[in-house]
């Protein structure tokens, strides 16, 4: 079994970064296709096939130092871009995705939660649960705000530094 998601690839720094079912993340050379490294974002856990689904569910996000990814029923984790060394990992579950800026990694978690983690340490900075149990889109950064859509047709605007919901508008 795999999670139906919009997982994709990210091209950056002469490499292709891609997440796969089973919680794997790989970096391959864009020039010759050679595998640079392969890491585990999240290990499958549980007894049943449903419990063991830990697919990387969105495109990895990349900056000059790190590549970060999130797995369904698993973890959000960041790795060194050059060799795949794990920098940090935290328990999280997302079928929507994540994004990052210079300070934080933002994750749309299950059950309508948006969370921010410190980019360097993985420390939890804030969680916004006021959006209820809505199905949320992958987060997008717009200036000092995090934007997420929901399954009721609303666009939600959160402050990036504390997660406060500052605006909500129907589409």
Task: Locate the predicted segments by residue.
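Structural signature of WD-repeat beta-propellers
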Residues: 20-21, 64, 71-72, 109-110, ...
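Extracytoplasmic beta-rich repeat domains
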Residues: 1-13, 38-62, 87-101, 125-143, ...
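C-terminal closing repeat unit and adjoining cap/tail of repeat-based domains
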Residues: 121, 145, 150-171
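Short loop/turn segments that connect beta-strands within beta-propeller blades
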Residues: 29-33, 80-83, 118-121, 159-163
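Conserved mixed alpha/beta catalytic, RNA-binding, or beta-rich assembly cores of soluble enzyme
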Residues: 102-108
